[in-house]
Structures are given as C-alpha cells and as structure tokens.
Amino acid sequence: MCGGYYSYNEPHRPEFPGESRYQGQVLHPQFWPEDLDYEGKKVIVIGSGATAMTIVPSMTQKGAQVTMVQRSPTYVVSRPAEDKIANTLRKWLPEKWAYAITRLKNTTLSGYFYRQTRSQPAKTKAQLLGMATANLGEEMVKAHFTPSYNPWDQRMCLIPDGDLYQSINEGSAQVVTGDIETWTEQGLVMKDGTEVTGDIIVTATGITLTVMSGIAFDLDGTAINFPDTFTYKGMMYSGIPNMAHTFGYINASWTLRADLTAEYVCRLLNHMTANQQAVATPTLRPEDANMPTEDWIQDFSAGYMRRMMHLFPKQGQGPWRNTQDYKLDKKMIRRAPIEDGVLVFGDSGNIAPAMDSPTLTKVA
C-alpha cells in the first residue's frame, strides 16, 4: 500500500466561534479553487505549519497582503533552494557518483542534526533562534518565532531562501500570535483584543491522518483492526499475511524510508519466489507475549499525529519497531536476513515472477 498518510477528503478543520458572521471568502488549502483571485486583497492565513508557511510568501509574491494567524510559534529554518555542493559535484563527476555523495551528505547531516536536538535541546534551540533573529530581529522572533517546546518535539518548517522572512521584512506579510476569540464580519478578533481584517480567510489548520488510506480490510471474513496489531519493521503487521505499508520518516526525508520499504518488499518477493513460497506472515513469538508496548510514533507531540495515534499499530521490541531512524533501519531492513524466525512462510502455486530491487536505494 502506497496510498499516502492523510485523508484527501477530510482535512482537520476545527470550527471557530462566529464563523457564520464572516462576509468574505473562506477556503481550505486542500480544496484550493483554481480561479482564486487574490491580487491586491487582504488575506488571513490561519495556521503555522508547512502549508501556511508555503502559502504566505507565495501569495505575497502575487500581490496579496497576508496576515498569518498562529495559535503558537513553530521553529522555522531557512535553507537554500538549491544545493550548491550537489550542483558542483554534478559538473565534475558522473551523475551516479554525484548523487551518491550528495545523498550521503544529506542523510548524515540530517541524522546528526536530529540526534543533536534530542541530546542537546537547549543548545539547538538557541542556535535555531539565533538564525531566525539574524533574519528578523530579536523582537519579532521573541514574539512570534519562539516555540514553548524543544526542537523536533514537533516538526520544524524549512523555508527556501528565507522567502517567508523576506515577505515579513518587506511588509507584505505580518504575523499575529494568540488564540482566536471570534470571527467577525470583516475578519477575526483575538482574545487579547487584536483585530485582523481580510477579504479571504485560508484555514491552513492541518491534516487528518489515515491508516492504509482508510480502506477496510478483512482476513478470511474477519475485519482487521490495525490497532490490535504490532508493526513489523515499520511496514508489515503482525498476523496479517502479504501486506506492507509505506510510511516515511517524520524527522527526515519521507522518501528515505519509502525507498527502504520498496527495497525490502522486492527482497521478500524474490526470496519467496526462489523458495516457492506464496505467503509471508509476521507472527508474534512466545517471547513476544509480554514485551512492553509503545505508540506507533514516539517523542512527537504534533497535534495531527497525536489525534490519530489510536488508529495505528503498536510497537514492541526487536523487529516489532518503527524506529524512525534511517541508520538503524538500513541495518534492520536492508541487511538483516529475510528468514528471521518472525516471518512465517507458506507454500502455494502461482508464484509471481521475480522483481528487480530498486536501484535508487543502492547508494548511501
């Protein structure tokens, strides 16, 4: 299953007091109208996640005056839109070598940074706020870009070439932080009395996670309840045969884990073909009966994740883990033997032809 991880039909859309009073246009980013005309208009964007921080500078660049209204601040990091090292390597090295070196650089640096946020949160926080202050000034950062939590307790926002900062410094974007008291005919009133007016309100209020794209599965006529299962290597489910699910990293590039999952599935299918096996089922062993359990995702307090955690499989020990650690996953997923005493295989005819392993994951 590679169906994504959030609902395309039902975004997270809380109701606000007084919404019916508002006389302007209201829209959610998941249902963006193609003919939306906002040039020269005042726009209110409610939210402080990646969606809001992408929308705000984009709309200002096309002539809108935008106010981003956030309940609480988010860590924001400016990164170059283009990787100069990668571009230089491509000029002088074969494409395959340049790609491999760039990938190794990026995975190493992102892994190091995440581990630093866990081991030295105060130091990392000071570094991040220092970079933001260099772009916006101390007063702005203290008021609107200093989260109450530590880095990577929730996802951070990367902005290309500081585009959000540029919009703020140019005066085409503003930030208001606090709780919304009510909507009015012209916009919003905050609990501290601040009034925000706009012709359009964009509710960038988040996504709704789904498990297996919300599809109902059954096994021999019995409905499958995924919270009753344990995750196997972050991709399969205890007691459920021949089913794998792609779920990436929340603390690194999503596709790193998607690559590993695809490679493992190909390895597994080729192993089953070579051994005339048609069924592979992750199966709890007697020694797994009393292992401690944890949520599908640990040490991550983002609301969109915590709201839906009860729908996901549990974690345990050994292979029953969703590590969210690329270095560990490479060992567990790429190098560990297929026959590990946990996967139980069954025989049958009608074996599918062997599949080639993805070449993309052969580096790094």
Q: What residues fall within each predicted segment?
A:
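Flavin (primarily FAD) cofactor-binding/catalytic cores of flavoenzymes
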Residues: M1-I44, S48-A50, T54-P57, Q61-M68, ...
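Hydrophobic transmembrane alpha-helix bundles
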Residues: Y8, N106-R115, T177-L188, H310-I333
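C-terminal, flexible cofactor-proximal segment of oxidoreductases
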Residues: A52, T74-S78, N87-R90, T231, ...
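Short, charge-rich amphipathic segments
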Residues: I55-V66, R90-K105, D192-T205, E294-D299, ...
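Soluble, non-transmembrane catalytic domains of enzymes that act on hydrophobic metabolites at membranes
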Residues: V56-Q61, Q65-D83, N275
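Short acidic (Asp/Glu) and glycine-rich catalytic loops that position anionic groups and cofactors
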Residues: V66, L104-Y112, A143-H144, P241-H245, ...
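Glycine-rich active-site loop/strand segments that organize a redox cofactor
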Residues: P73-A134
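Charged, low-complexity surface segments at secondary-structure and domain boundaries
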Residues: L109-S119, Y149-D153, T281-M291
